[in-house]
UniProtKB/Swiss-Prot annotation:
Keywords: Cytoplasm, Hydrolase, Nuclease, Ribosome biogenesis. Signal peptide: none annotated. Residues 154-163 have a biased composition (Basic residues). It is an enzyme of class 3 (hydrolase). NCBIfam families: RNAse_H_YqgF. The keyword Cytoplasm applies. Residues 144-188 are annotated as: Disordered. Transmembrane segments: none annotated. Could be a nuclease involved in processing of the 5'-end of pre-16S rRNA. This is Putative pre-16S rRNA nuclease. GO terms for molecular function: nuclease activity.
């Protein structure tokens, strides 16, 4: 496992939860909750500033896949958000990780901590980011980093897909990180 701070982002339609881990990558902790700012992207700028201030080696972004594993409208919005982060802080890789059960895990943890449903709103996004990041750290310690990394030159990024057993295959991805098959150049 690579050492270094990772920042996790749980993006919702109204709020964005942030979590970070220690430099050894052992434990995830809540950072704060941001208010979404779709018109001006102040939330994205705050994420970039937080990543730089902490010297993050990676940003983990929750990808809300459908229960069948497909990318529905929520996942497409998250992919667009990932692209904004990549453009805002290009020196830090963004890893897209399946977050299907992170909010459920966050609710369970908050209930176990004795919080009431009314108190959840302020912290549930942070808690979901903690669940997402801790699962990512735990998986990476086994040698199988989950999800895929969005990185590369503007407009044409490579996404590294992890399959069973941790083997990866490279595919071209669009600006939002969505995989596309390679186009063969020079055929004619």
């Amino acid at each position: 496992m690579r050492p270094g701070v990772r920042l996790a982002v749980d993006v919702g339609s109204v709020r964005v939860g942030l979590a970070a881990c220690d430099p050894a990558g052992v434990i995830a902790s809540p950072v704060r909750t941001l208010v979404r700012d779709p018109g001006h992207d102040a939330d994205v700028a705050e994420i970039a500033a937080e990543a730089r201030a902490r010297g993050a080696v990676e940003i983990v972004l929750g990808l809300p896949l459908s229960l069948d594993g497909s990318e529905g409208p929520a996942a497409l919005r998250a992919l667009d958000y990932a692209d904004k982060i990549v453009r805002s802080v290009p020196e830090v890789p963004v890893r897209l990780v399946d977050e299907r059960l992170s909010t459920v895990g966050a609710h369970r943890a908050l209930h176990a901590a004795g919080l009431k449903e009314k108190q959840f709103r302020a912290v549930v996004d942070q808690a979901a980011a903690v669940v997402l990041l801790q699962a990512t750290l735990d998986a990476e310690r086994t040698g199988h980093a989950p999800g895929r990394v969005v990185a590369g030159p503007k407009g044409r990024r490579k996404a590294r897909h992890r399959g069973q057993g941790g083997t990866g295959t490279e595919q071209q991805a669009d600006a939002g990180g969505r995989a596309r098959p390679h186009a063969t150049e020079g055929k004619g």
